Amino acid sequence: MKINGVKGMNDVLPADVARWHEMEAVAREVFALYGYREVRTPAVEHAALFARGVGEATDIVNKEMYVFEDKGEELLALRPEGTAGTVRAFIEHGAFVEGPQKWFYMGPMFRRERPQKGRYRQFHQIGCEAFGVAEPYLDAEQIALLADYFARLGVTAELKLNSVGDAQCRPAYLADLKAYLVANQGALCADCKDRIERNPLRVLDCKVESCQPVLEQAPRLLERLCEPCRAHFDQVKAGLDALGVAYRVEPRLVRGLDYYVRTAYEFTSDALGSQSAVAGGGRYDRLVETLGGPPTPGIGFALGEERLSMILEKVGRAAPERRPAVFFVSADATGALEALRLAAGLRRAGIACELDPRGGKLKAQFKQAERVGARWAVVLGGNEVATGQAKLKDLQTREETPVALSELAARVSG
């Protein structure tokens, strides 16, 4: 009986992995320009980390997190997002004593949500976290980093910006919002009704069409910001203006995690047919303290690799895949052995090459050479080995020229 993959867990095949390599390589290049260093944290953490850090009232913790008991009866979880684990590592290893830190991560996350195009139960994120700086110009710089990253990949994305306030101004707003939503809950969908008590701010993020008239008239947090939050938001916008990063203020933009304060932002793209989020982030000035560390401001973002890969494919960006320079076509056993030896030498010289150990008909081997995208084909048999000369075929121009086997590396390395 055939065993298929688990529902919602997606295979990324070699043709697509090449695009992922590019996304990750460009991320490393751009992040390094801004001073971010890579951190790697486990996929498994204590479930309490996310309950406390992400928020027990969130859909992620309430409905979507994979939680299990190990043999020691500890309650563990597959990480549903990357920030909490990165903050835990920042605290556990005492990185805060070294002053401000900029870290980035890449890896799989897990949420048991309904699988759909571009969304899987195992998905991959690239994220940045900056610790130790409360000033708003860091917010602008990090957003500019993400804008630079998308530009390098040739992706057009719109920046949506908002402030979600803080502990000083948000509670009074949430009370007003909750009262408004309760008064109008008859016009809201079931999910929105459920969130009114648990997480009323998330109701504003609902995409259900029938909810929109109510949400359009909902109280706006931007109009209720305290003076420090308003000043912070104004300086973030000034920083983005100075950096030449275009943005649109979106009063209904909220983040799905409880730890966000002040700056919240998303990059969206319509490349997949509708305005869908490609990346999102914001400020979390109390999270380090909430998880047991000293008071430390922070800001971070995450982007989804699956969705970004789909966008790159949609806009026609070819996945850069390294092809072999040379394919050895073996005419007989003597030629196959010599191909093995020559291939080893070319690889030591940094030249990619392939051969078919099965040998077989020359026509079939030439077809394989074209299938793998080789630039050159070299036919080897007993006669070529004896004379030290072979024919070098350019598979693009179809021209054949003689080549001394001792000079093969020089001929194909250009």
From Swiss-Prot:
Q: How does it assemble?
A: Homodimer.
Its subcellular locations are:
Cytoplasm
GO-annotated cellular components: cytoplasm
PROSITE patterns with a match to the protein in the record: AA_TRNA_LIGASE_II
InterPro entries recorded for this chain? aa-tRNA-synth_II (IPR006195), aa-tRNA-synth_II/BPL/LPL (IPR045864), Anticodon-bd (IPR004154), Anticodon-bd_dom_sf (IPR036621), His-tRNA-ligase (IPR015807), HisRS-like_core (IPR041715), HisRS/HisZ (IPR004516), HisRS_anticodon (IPR033656)
Give the protein's recorded name: Histidine--tRNA ligase
Q: Which organism is it from?
A: Anaeromyxobacter dehalogenans (strain 2CP-1 / ATCC BAA-258)
The gene name reads hisS
Q: Nucleotide-binding: is it a keyword of this entry?
A: yes
